[in-house]
Amino acid sequence: MGQLRLKMANRANDGFYSVFFLRKFSKLLTWLAVRVKATPNQVTLISFAIGLYSAFCFTKGSFSQTLLGAVLLQISIIVDCVDGELARYTRKFSKLGAWLDAVTDRVKEYMVFLGLAIGAEKSGEDLWVPALVMMLIQTFRHLSDYNFARTVKLRAESQFLTPVDYAADFDGIVPTEREPKGRLRYWLGKIIQFPIGERWLVISTSAVIGGASFTFTVMPILAAISALVVYRGRIARTLKMERLPSRGILISAQQDSLILKLNFIKRFDWLTPSLLRAIETLLLLWIFIINEQINTVTFIIIFTIVFHHYDNLYRSLQNEKKPVWLSCLGLFIEGRLLLLGIAAFGEWNLSYIAWYFALLFLLTSSLQWVLSHRANKVR
């Protein structure tokens, strides 16, 4: 019975690399976690710690440390599979667990980008712009993935499948039609979606083979190919929808803008958060580049802002909004652009702004969310 429950704990709609490699190992760790009575959140934090140490190894820049970082990144994602399997095995699901699993994945991935850029800098390479562009690409894709899936679910169109739910660890998986497909075509479709397993495999292997510069060359190319295929299908499906914006607070809760609304895109409003993030990040990149201030500090500033937008996303997926006071302290898109523009052109010390955003978006906002949901450990 235990073996059957363990087998049934596998998540549906998983990626090729996860199914045929990662979960072969994660099942063993899940069995061990059950025996020692570990909780899903404890496993998530272990995976988080391993992922952060992986990023730290990448900062060293040497081949041996890069190899260690690549191996640890794979171990991190194997352990990351365990928290979901353990939750499904024990039937212990929580909003806190879903939020923690989602945000730690994003932090690990972007800290690895940071680590690779720092390591490359020690070898005389300037890869800050590619690292930031890769973070922007992934943010644009992630937000649109989640929002498209939830929009389809809300519209409840008969021609779409019900998408994977937020609590089921959605990452790069798009709803598929019910028509049967050949096994090869099915798995090729999974791979080209470029989910987290495949992404982290590419990061690990490319960093070992050719270093950070190779990683930041290969990753955007593969991400672009994936986006071309995925968005082609999504646009076709969206054109079949009613010419009306989505209902509820899903999109409005992610606006984070006093002026920019993009209401004109109507049925394509699932793209609104991604487009707003692209506008803000590209303008910040332009400001920092022309002022020659692309470095660790500016990466941290943009990362904390990106984290803030992910926080808004995860709250909206649970039909919640960030408290007004937190949004006001975050200055909205317009306020942040004004502040950072003045600071960059005025040659201020940007470290203070980085600390402010880190304390606000990473610490205060996270604590507010966790404390507000402590009473809902199991749903």
Which sequence ranges carry the predicted segments?
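Membrane-embedded alpha-helical segments that form the functional core of polytopic membrane enzymes
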Residues: P40-L96, F113, P130-M134, T215-T217, ...
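Short acidic/polar alpha-helix capping motifs at helix-coil junctions
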Residues: V36, A49-G51, A167-A168
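A feature for the membrane-embedded catalytic helix bundles of lipid/isoprenoid biosynthetic enzymes
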Residues: M1-T30, V103-R379
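Helix-loop junctions at the membrane-solvent interface of multi-pass transporters
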Residues: K37, C57-G61, I287-I290, G346
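Loop-to-transmembrane helix entry/capping segments in MFS-fold secondary transporters
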Residues: S94-A98, E320-P323
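Short amphipathic alpha-helical coupling elements at transmembrane boundaries
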Residues: K27-V34, G84, R88-R91, A98, ...
